[in-house]
């Protein structure tokens, strides 16, 4: 299926790029910062704002060195309800990544339009199965995986009732070195799975997501922050509002530039054709009744007369009007055979 519907938006072939501002954990555990992220994402032109939903104790071992960090960034269920309501109020789609099984039910009850699965959970089949059974579209990031693992994950989703799947090419290094971005994998995934494919970006800057649209990405996900200098794990590699807005604008420009793929003269160049192409013209003065030959004709701009591609047709034809040097020769100037 080359096109699916998320909320009121179609995503896939022939549709505008679906742009997700990945708020992630950049709210720093503060609902007010979260709301500001929602507001700024809308102002920047994002189609959706996305967060990460979890209960730390169900997500990370208490013995992990990262437990306290993630605990400090955790938002409550009530706060996610509040963020979703605020997003809907200002007209931007709310999506979240469930990082534990409980949050699948919570987000489904909130009636999120789609589920996002993190790259690290591509092989977490209990989560895939539970999400698939909601019947909601699934956006699946594919960092750290190979085609076999992606194929198996897609089959798990499909076998549990999910029919609307989007794959995101992703490299799970933060930030991703440019030599590892491998944007051509977007084309590989499209050719194998025949479903919408996008790109989840972790590079510095905005070049990679913009280029990925030219390579066929249907969805772009980019980390989004209010300020790159804020404390937290993802702020430094995220796009701030100015950068994100520039990315959105550039993506929309790329969409215009890509066009239909049909090779025809464009409206903006039609007037140029006459001036840029050549006509058959008189090389010297030509008398009425004289035969046209390579000795008395030349090929010059503008292209208002007989096109040069018809040279073989007009050679040895008589001319019925006197022509001065550099006069354009028209079909009406020729006598019959």
From Swiss-Prot:
This is Uncharacterized protein MJ1065. SUPFAM superfamilies: AFP III-like domain (SSF51269), Aldolase (SSF51569). PANTHER family: N-ACETYLNEURAMINATE SYNTHASE, SIALIC ACID SYNTHASE. Gene3D superfamilies: Aldolase class I, Antifreeze-like/N-acetylneuraminic acid synthase C-terminal domain. To B.subtilis SpsE. One of its GO terms (biological process) is glycosylation. SMART domains: SAF.
